[in-house]
Amino acid sequence: MSNITDPQMWDFDDLNFTGMPPTDEGYSPCRLETETLNKYVVIITYALVFLLSLLGNSLVMLVILYSRVGRSVTDVYLLNLALADLLFALTLPIWAASKVNGWIFGTFLCKVVSLLKEVNFYSGILLLACISVDRYLAIVHATRTLTQKRHLVKFVCLGCWGLSMNLSLPFFLFRQAYHPNNSSPVCYEVLGNDTAKWRMVLRILPHTFGFIVPLFVMLFCYGFTLRTLFKAHMGQKHRAMRVIFAVVLIFLLCWLPYNLVLLADTLMRTQVIQESCERRNNIGRALDATEILGFLHSCLNPIIYAFIGQNFRHGFLKILAMHGLVSKEFLARHRVTSYTSSSVNVSSNL
């Protein structure tokens, strides 16, 4: 077995959990010149994201589940988005601990948390693509038959979860806890003699069907949706779309940088661009930083709903009023002030 496929020969100090083994037969290990990121800053960041995500997404799910009468198709999608973020947030303490002592949690947790990370990403973009199609049909084609049949939305969401699981399944099957000599233990893919080739397949196929295709679907649908709104001068409907546009924008700002860096790393590993120690180090640092940005996404949607989503604020206050935590007079005043700007709620979202 050559040094490119034998885990004993890899320099794991240079590789993060998303890195790849070197592909060059004449490869010699590269050493990082400086620590990529202060691990304690990363740990504190993960802890804050965990707490905010746990609290925020739980509140989002609570508000949507309480509002059974006025629950829309978009609300069902956003409920599933919150569930995906909440499940991923539960893994953040494990990711944080691994930054200190390496991967000490064994193979099973290695598989599970890797699976949840990928499922969170893919389900997020697939659900957002479904929302874009729903808004496109409702606004551009004025189609209400599909959007009003909520039982169909449940099957669409199940399809998104199923596809996300399939796209993420290789991480569950092939990731293992491994403790190389003279290095901290890692959670890593072990694919046998053809590790480099199969890792290319495991990158290209999921990101094509789980990122690029849904991204183009969103760009197409929202492009025509915005065109229709501006052309028809639908000011109220445009304002009602603000939450959805904000959610999509935040998702792209958080996950697009990581995927672009991952693409650069893939091009380097396949020798499309020249590989060097300096380039490996730069890409490694960028992967670390952009992965944290992606993790941060799991706590941001509830913040968007709180600041932009009038229905979410009213639903939350309604729950508080039901339990005597705010007065019904205050709730009534809030309802009156928010009615004028949300009376035409084309997205029926938070």
Curated annotation (Swiss-Prot):
Locations listed in the record: Cell membrane
Main location: membrane
GO cellular-component term (any): external side of plasma membrane
Membrane topology (Cytoplasmic): 67-75, 134-154, 221-242, 309-350
Gene: CXCR1
Family: Belongs to the G-protein coupled receptor 1 family.
GO molecular function: C-C chemokine binding; C-C chemokine receptor activity; C-X-C chemokine receptor activity; interleukin-8 binding
Family annotation (InterPro entries): CCR1-9-like, Chemokine_CXCR1, Chemokine_CXCR_1/2, GPCR_Rhodpsn, GPCR_Rhodpsn_7TM
Positions annotated with a glycan in the UniProt record: N3, N16
Spans within the Extracellular topological domain: 1-39, 97-111, 175-199, 265-285
Keyword annotations of the record: Cell membrane, Chemotaxis, Disulfide bond, G-protein coupled receptor, Glycoprotein, Membrane, Receptor, Transducer, Transmembrane, Transmembrane helix
PANTHER family: C-X-C CHEMOKINE RECEPTOR TYPE 1, CELL ADHESION MOLECULE
CDD domains in alphabetical order: 7tmA_CXCR1_2
PROSITE patterns: G_PROTEIN_RECEP_F1_1, G_PROTEIN_RECEP_F1_2
Protein name according to UniProt: C-X-C chemokine receptor type 1
Role description: Receptor to interleukin-8, which is a powerful neutrophils chemotactic factor. Binding of IL-8 to the receptor causes activation of neutrophils. This response is mediated via a G-protein that activates a phosphatidylinositol-calcium second messenger system.
GO biological process, one term: calcium-mediated signaling
